[in-house]
């Protein structure tokens, strides 16, 4: 990181289930390593949740927040029938914003969350 100019780093930690202690420890180690190389890093820690997950998403988000200190949520798969209602509880209980929504499979389908547009789409 120090030898090149980097503005963003995205880490895909697929399979890091909140119930797998060893995998959660690995992701915490990644975070500690980043902080050693760049003071203050990571600057954002987003949890990407599948809108179809349901009530399990709340316990999942709590565990990731306890481990990493979440700064926001990205909610995907809103192009289907899922409404993602659990995200309201998650954002409220963890005091983190919903920052992005996924409404398809393309890059352009990851959008900055717009609360008014989100509510309008519910009806």
Predicted regions and their residues:
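P-loop/Walker A NTP-binding module and the surrounding RecA-like catalytic core of P-loop NTPases
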Residues: 1-123
């Amino acid at each position: 990181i120090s030898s090149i100019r980097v503005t963003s780093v995205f880490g895909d930690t697929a399979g890091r289930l909140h119930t797998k202690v060893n995998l959660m420890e690995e992701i915490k180690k990644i975070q500690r390593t980043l902080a050693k190389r760049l003071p203050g890093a990571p600057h954002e820690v987003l949890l990407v949740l599948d809108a179809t997950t349901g009530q399990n998403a709340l316990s999942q988000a709590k565990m990731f927040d306890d481990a990493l200190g979440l700064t926001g949520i990205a909610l995907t798969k809103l192009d289907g029938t899922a409404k993602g209602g659990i995200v309201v509880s998650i954002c409220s209980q963890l005091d983190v914003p919903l920052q992005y929504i996924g409404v398809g499979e393309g890059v352009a389908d990851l959008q900055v969350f717009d609360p008014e547009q989100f509510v309008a789409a519910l009806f």
